[in-house]
C-alpha cells in the first residue's frame, strides 16, 4: 500500500511547475529536518552524512527507503514525514543534485 501511495504521488508531481513548487517546499522541509546532519547545501563537509547531491534520478526508491527506515546513523523518519513531504524533499534533492 505504501508503494502505491508513492506511485500516485509521483504521477501527481510530474508536472514541471508542480515540481518547482515541490522543490521550494522541499527546501523548507530540508532546512527544518535534514540540514543539521546533511549540511545547508545537501553535503556535510565533515563527512558525517551522505552527500545527497550524488543521488541519481533512478534512486528514488533508495531515497524513500532511507528516509522512512533510516540508514547507518540516520534515524527513521516514518511517522514524522508523510509521503508528500518526502516527495517534496526528493524534488529539492533532485533539483540540486549533480546532473
What are these regions (language model features)?
Residues 1-4:
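Positively charged n-region of N-terminal signal peptides that target proteins for export
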Residues 6-10:
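Hydrophobic helical h-region of N-terminal Sec-dependent signal peptides
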Residues 11-29:
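Electrostatic cytochrome c docking/interface patches
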Residues 23, 27-31, 81, 98-99:
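Short sequence/structural segments immediately N-terminal
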Residues 23-27, 39-66:
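Gly/Gly-Pro-rich "capping" loops immediately C-terminal to redox-active cysteine motifs
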Residues 30-36, 41, 70:
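Short pre-active-site segment immediately N-terminal to redox-active cysteine/selenocysteine motifs
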Residues 45-53, 68-99:
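Axial heme c-ligation environment in periplasmic c-type cytochrome domains
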Amino acid at each position: 500500500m505504501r508503494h502505491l501511495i508513492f506511485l500516485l504521488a509521483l504521477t501527481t508531481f510530474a508536472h514541471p511547475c508542480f515540481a518547482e513548487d515541490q522543490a521550494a517546499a522541499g527546501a523548507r522541509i530540508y532546512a527544518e529536518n535534514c540540514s543539521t546532519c546533511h549540511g545547508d547545501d545537501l553535503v556535510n563537509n565533515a563527512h558525517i552524512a551522505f552527500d545527497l547531491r550524488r543521488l541519481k534520478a533512478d534512486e528514488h526508491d533508495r531515497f524513500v527507503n532511507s528516509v522512512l527506515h533510516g540508514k547507518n546513523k540516520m534515524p527513521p523518519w516514518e511517522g514524522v514525514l508523510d509521503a508528500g513531504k518526502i516527495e517534496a524533499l526528493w524534488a529539492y534533492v533532485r533539483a540540486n543534485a549533480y546532473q
